Amino acid sequence: FGDSVLYKADSSEYLIKTAEQHIEGDITITEVKDLIDSYYESKGVRLDVEHEGTEEADKVAARITEILSEKSFSFTPDFLIRIHQRLFCGVYGHAGQIRQRNISKKEWILDGDTVTYSGYDMIRQTLDYDFSQEKGTDYPSMSADQAIKRICKFVSGIWQIHPFAEGNTRTTAVFTMKYLQTFGFKPDNTIFRD
């Protein structure tokens, strides 16, 4: 959980306690996911669930930790879509599906400004183009500063496409962390906080 994109303000006390057990090595990530699922399956009969918003945060945080702990990675739009499906299965009815309508949203990360996202009918083509451009990047010939700028440009482009109706920022963050791992980096959520 130390590597997950986890915001304690959005998470339940139950998740935090369960995460501590995982960090201490007392339980596996599979056990964490099972415990979180059981916790919310029985929430209707319990009075100690803090508020409705924690279920999504808790389930997704556990799934992020699981995905980041896996060695597998494929530099493809399909892998990005699969991350979205795994993060939000059972949370959103559209998990793992490219959005089917145009959207605009005020983004907290931009102090409430809006962004022009890719048109829904061009999402797949735009993803394919951005991924093909990134695949052709010759990182060994770049300085560290050039490489960082190039990766940032690629990641911000994927985010601006906004391929999903919801969950784009977390999906892009997890994909980015997996991608950076292929370069030998061990990123954690602090790179997304500042």
PLM feature spans:
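FIC/Doc superfamily catalytic core
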Residues: 1-194
